[in-house]
Amino acid sequence: MLQMILNVTGMSLRNLLKNLVKFLKPSNQIIVGLLFLSSSLYSAVQIVQPSENAYEDIQEALILAEPGDVIRFTSGVFNLQDSLSLDIEGVQIEGEGMDQTILNFSNQQSGAQGLSVTSDNVTLQDFSIQNAKGDAIKVKGVTNIKFLRVKTEWTNGPSPENGAYGLYPVESTNVLIDGCIAIGASDAGIYVGQSKNIIVRNSRAEFNVAGIEIENSYYADVFNNVATNNTGGILVFDLPGLPQQGGHHVRVFNNRSVGNNTDNFAPEGNIVGEVPRGTGIIIQANSNVEIFNNEIGNNDTVNIAVVTYGNETDDETYYPHPKSIQIHGNKFGPTGY
């Protein structure tokens, strides 16, 4: 009977109990209140399978989700025409593996991202996003975001027509990117901007303009990653004209930044379009940056560059020079040829 009521009303058990309380005597409200508390202890798992209505099915699950819920995509290819968005906190979105669960945006008609997240305490894991019209996954203004074994890719190879960013958390706190892969972004494959308390580890960036980029951010550790076949492997940048400036305390260690010799394919006018082909690591206008125990080689132009921001700016608060940079214990291969 309860399941029949839920099916007819379209409510979750938690919402049904909330509404029921309004019509009961105080003594019975206590009982229903205890039932509500019990229901809240258990997260709902919503399973979504590929179908002709994949966009509607997924977006409905994202809209109706409640804190603590899991939205699980089964194996298969989900062909999507519009951008997805999540603004409910405490939700986990998961697939059955980055090579098994694929959200395909090749025919995307609207939206600036594949998936947009604007809520706290979200975990994204075990799925891929392909050929998004803009950024693959953008996360903005959140606390506690995890990307675990997520893959973003533009499958037609390097092109200025590709979306700008693969994984794109910005203006966020407590960012974890672990075991991810980013391929083919026309700006940066893995990008963390204007954020603080950041870990990027065990991930791979390939055939992007910038493989991994930490920009205008505080307290970042980038380690155990591979950046290869990009224009530039790993970038630590600070730029003017942004709400958060003065990037500092970034550690880049135990990474391989090798063979980053792909021609720069950024759209005209992008700042990353100035990165020379064949760059291992660039530090620009940051302070307290430590680069150690990395393998850096076979980058045609330079293995490590420490540079001042050289463009003119009207931002009087911006400091364009790097300071307190430590580089030690790295293994260098051929460069500058």
Regions found by a protein language model. Name each.
Residues 1-24:
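N-terminal secretory signal peptides that target proteins for export/translocation
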Residues 29-39:
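Bacterial N-terminal signal peptides
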Residues 41-60, 77:
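Right-handed parallel beta-helix/beta-solenoid
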Residues 49-56, 70, 90-134, 156:
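Right-handed parallel beta-helix/beta-spiral solenoid domain characteristic of secreted/periplasmic
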Residues 58-64, 79-88:
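Short, T/G/N/S-enriched strand-turn elements that build extracellular solenoid repeat scaffolds
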Residues 81, 105-115, 131-138, 159-169, ...:
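Extracellular beta-strand/beta-solenoid scaffold signature
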